[in-house]
């Protein structure tokens, strides 16, 4: 090797190899996407980001990362030649060549360290950019058309969407890049080191027949055989890792629920029940972990045995030629180094099978997330149209997720400013009707006409966002749209004047305010927004009858043009509404 020309030679080698790698890698991705299920899953989240129509930058960035990977391969090839020359100088007691090799080692080491640092930065930059893009895509898909709500009512419930967006996205991107660069590094190195080993390997006599370069065939046969066994041992890890993700997410969610419903659990003294449920879920996690551990012991144990054998395997083959003085110590050491590299590259697919198992589980969770959203969005046959003033139901039929009819062929017209009270037995479909109007319920068909862009829903347990009280009052709009004076005036109207001095305080208002106060805060929000239609789902259930009467009177005074549709059980609500819709058994209904 002419070290004086090595920089130019290496540059040419990297450019040529980069061109070949780009073509082969692209064709390989095409075949995977076309003919494998996991390839199609991979492309669901990579195709949009890597598309030149969106931006050419990701592809250029990836090519730069591949170029740095090839630079590392080239440095390792130069390092192999350095091994040979350094050990040969030791065998021949050539001090001049030895120190020359030490100087060369400094150059090789500096190049290797620099390449590693630059590669790390480029890879992390690429990963972060991809995570940002993919996170935005999935969050938008989850929030669009209220899919975050609809997916809760699918027959195959979408578990832990938070983990799929936050954790699985990062795992997918990082593993995709590491596997891609790993494959490129392994294949490129394998070809390069095979050429080197071909020149180093001597002939061997097998059953009386001399076979040239026998070591090359032996190492390939050895690795292929061990890889097949490793795949057989590691295959169950794919499903086990998927189950592990689900069990851990469910356990974590149960812990969060205890914090969320701490007061209710405390009132019921339900600690024993909750603790037993936690132990059951935790035991399931531990059991699955032990199954993974025992499977990994078999898989990793086999890999470790294979790795130990590979240390002495080339030595046993080449030592005869060394003792016969057919090769020098430098050649022997280079053979060991080249064999080790070639074995590692050939074993890449075997040793990373457990990583691929986790990767496949991540792909299944992410694609399951997207399929659930598509199913939730495509299921509804309800046609919801905008109407400037009125609320009109035409042949509206609603079912529960099991297919039982709750409401059949509902036909009602509510002119602007009308108030309607919906009553019926528990489970009759009162709240479900409101969900259908809002476009949240997929198990319905028919036609709804209403002011679709000017609605507000008040639930029994109002949503109070994080932040100060001013933000909670303005939600879902920005707090900058209302003045302090206006906010104080509205709080006084809903009998929450004692909170006026705390409008700018950031606290956990859900825990500070009673449920009745939260409901009055929701009424203040309703008066502030002045919607064309207001839907009240037992929005006064935590108020006494006097407060309830005051709140509805306030709505009539402040929002005379707003159509009010309420759900409630109290008989006192009847006098506060102009019409009643009674939901009866078997989908029947009656308007009073």
UniProtKB/Swiss-Prot annotation:
Membrane-protein topology: Multi-pass membrane protein
Domain ABC transmembrane type-1 residue range list: 58-358
Alphabetized UniProt keyword annotations: ATP-binding, Cell inner membrane, Cell membrane, Membrane, Nucleotide-binding, Transmembrane, Transmembrane helix, Transport
Name of protein: Uncharacterized ABC transporter ATP-binding protein HI_0036
Record SUPFAM superfamilies: ABC transporter transmembrane region, P-loop containing nucleoside triphosphate hydrolases
Molecular-function annotations in GO: ABC-type transporter activity; ATP binding; ATP hydrolysis activity
Native source organism of the sequence: Haemophilus influenzae (strain ATCC 51907 / DSM 11121 / KW20 / Rd)
Family listed: Belongs to the ABC transporter superfamily.
């Amino acid at each position: 090797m002419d070290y004086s020309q090595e920089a130019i030679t290496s540059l040419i080698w990297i450019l040529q190899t980069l061109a070949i790698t780009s073509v082969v890698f692209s064709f390989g991705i095409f075949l995977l996407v076309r003919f494998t299920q996991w390839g199609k899953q991979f492309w669901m989240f990579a195709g949009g980001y890597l598309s030149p129509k969106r931006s050419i930058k990701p592809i250029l960035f990836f090519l730069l990362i591949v170029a740095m990977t090839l630079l590392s391969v080239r440095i390792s090839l130069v390092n192999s030649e350095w091994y040979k020359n350094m050990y040969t100088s030791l065998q021949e007691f050539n001090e001049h060549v030895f120190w020359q090799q030490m100087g060369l080692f400094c150059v090789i080491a500096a190049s290797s360290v620099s390449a590693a640092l630059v590669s790390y930065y480029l890879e992390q930059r690429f990963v972060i950019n991809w995570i940002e893009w993919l996170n935005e895509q999935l969050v938008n898909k989850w929030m669009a058309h209220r899919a975050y709500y609809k997916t809760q009512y699918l027959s195959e419930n979408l578990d832990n969407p938070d983990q799929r967006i936050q954790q699985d996205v990062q795992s997918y991107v990082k593993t995709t890049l590491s596997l891609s660069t790993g494959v490129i590094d392994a294949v490129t190195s394998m070809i390069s080191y095979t050429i080197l080993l071909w020149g180093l390997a001597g002939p061997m006599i097998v059953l009386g027949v001399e076979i040239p370069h026998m070591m090359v065939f032996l190492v390939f046969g050895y690795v292929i055989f061990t890889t097949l066994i490793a795949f057989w041992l590691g295959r169950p890890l794919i499903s086990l890792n998927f189950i592990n993700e689900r069990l851990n997410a469910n356990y974590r969610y149960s812990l969060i629920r205890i914090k969320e419903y701490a007061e209710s659990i405390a009132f019921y003294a339900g600690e024993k029940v909750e603790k037993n449920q936690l132990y059951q879920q935790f035991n399931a996690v531990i059991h699955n972990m032990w199954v993974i551990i025992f499977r990994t012991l078999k898989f990793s144990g086999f890999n470790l045995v294979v790795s130990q054998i590979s240390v002495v395997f080339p030595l046993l083959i080449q030592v005869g030629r060394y003792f016969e003085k057919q090769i020098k110590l430098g050649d022997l050491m280079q053979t060991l180094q080249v064999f080790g590299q070639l074995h590692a590259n050939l074993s890449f697919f075997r040793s990373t099978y457990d990583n691929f198992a986790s990767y496949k589980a991540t792909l299944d969770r992410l694609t399951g997330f997207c399929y659930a959203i598509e199913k939730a969005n495509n299921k509804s046959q309800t046609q919801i149209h905008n109407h400037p003033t009125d609320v009109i139901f035409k042949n509206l039929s609603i079912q529960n997720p099991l297919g039982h009819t709750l409401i059949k062929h509902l036909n009602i017209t509510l002119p602007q400013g009308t108030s309607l009270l919906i009553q019926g037995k528990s489970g009759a479909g009162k709240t479900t009707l409101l969900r259908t109007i809002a476009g949240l319920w997929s198990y319905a068909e028919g036609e709804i006409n209403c002011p679709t862009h000017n609605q507000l829903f008040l639930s029994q347990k109002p949503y109070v966002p994080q932040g100060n009280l001013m933000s909670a009052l303005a939600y879902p709009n920005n707090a900058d749209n209302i003045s302090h004076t206006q906010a104080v005036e509205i709080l006084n109207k809903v009998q929450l004047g004692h909170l006026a001095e705390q409008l700018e305080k950031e606290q956990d208002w859900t825990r500070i305010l009673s449920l009745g106060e939260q409901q009055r805060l929701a009424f203040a929000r309703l008066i502030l927004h002045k919607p064309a239609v207001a839907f009240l789902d037992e929005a006064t259930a935590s108020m006494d009858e006097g407060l309830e009467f005051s709140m509805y009177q306030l709505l009539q005074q402040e929002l005379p043009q707003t159509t009010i549709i309420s759900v409630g059980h109290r008989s006192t609500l009847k006098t506060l509404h102009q019409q009643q819709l009674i939901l009866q058994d078997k989908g029947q209904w009656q308007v009073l």
